[in-house]
């Protein structure tokens, strides 16, 4: 097949090939070029990245979907994203109500068979946060 898919169907292709025995400085090539250069006994390179690509790519899919859902439902635009975190800025009087909705939207961004719990913290700045 030559690719893996994330939870939302994005593909990461693994279509570079090289000789069975790796050589320092080797540049993997597309299949036809690899066969021409090294003969018919070539192997697909970088497949060790495939498993992690599914996990990390699916996490990115979930985060992107959550960001869009949060914006569409609340109008909140995240100030910053860090890996699997959304940093949002809200007026003091609306924080708790907005937080409950943001958490719900993040947990339900993509329906899964297992729960996806979220943690939340509130603070005046990133150095002064308390768990909620």
Label the model's feature ranges.
Residues 1-132:
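Conserved catalytic core of nucleotide polymerization and phosphodiester-bond processing enzymes
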